[in-house]
């Protein structure tokens, strides 16, 4: 950042050479430059993948420590619909349901870790998680692991499934069936 900041200050000085710049005007010009820099980096990150507002805020704060322009950039991105936790949570759940064997509890926890508000998490879970698909995922994981016959193996498999975010009720239902 230091090299870029010095280059920007030199450009500002060259552009306004011979003019008297007040400290306030100089700060406004520099702030506008920082805003553009942060905005561009935000778009670069969002082009790679969708982010929650919290995730993007963390990345920008880490990269642009002490810059107060981070929050205005995030607000502008939200206004322009480039950044939206509702859309992020729906896409996240849809993607994980298609590509991972995770249950609703794990999905909820992952979204909470990404700073998504509870209302968007619940909306995404309700609209994208189908109990019959969860059941099929649990059954597939049980088949893959081999149906446990002894109680210790059943407990171990149940714990594994629980860590993946499946409900205890669903796990018990599948494990209490005859082997598939």
Features from the language model and the residues they span:
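Short amphipathic alpha-helical interaction segments
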Residues: 66-73
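Short helix-coil junctions and helix-kink-helix linkers
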Residues: 59-66
């Amino acid at each position: 950042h230091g090299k870029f900041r010095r280059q920007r200050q030199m450009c500002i000085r060259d552009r306004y050479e011979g003019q008297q710049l007040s400290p306030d005007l100089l700060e406004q010009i520099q702030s506008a430059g920082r805003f553009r820099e942060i905005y561009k980096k935000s778009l670069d990150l969002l082009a790679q993948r969708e982010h929650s507002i919290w995730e993007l805020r963390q990345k920008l704060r880490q990269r642009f420590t002490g810059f107060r322009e981070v929050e205005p950039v995030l607000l502008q991105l939200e206004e322009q619909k480039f950044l939206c936790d509702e859309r992020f949570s729906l896409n996240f759940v849809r993607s994980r349901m298609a590509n991972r064997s995770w249950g609703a509890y794990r999905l909820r926890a992952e979204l909470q870790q990404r700073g998504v508000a509870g209302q968007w998490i619940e909306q995404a879970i309700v609209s994208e998680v189908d109990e019959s698909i969860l059941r099929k995922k649990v059954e597939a994981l049980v088949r893959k692991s081999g149906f446990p016959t002894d109680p210790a193996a059943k407990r171990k498999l149940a714990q594994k499934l629980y860590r993946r975010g499946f409900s205890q009720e669903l796990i018990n239902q599948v494990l209490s069936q005859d082997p598939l």
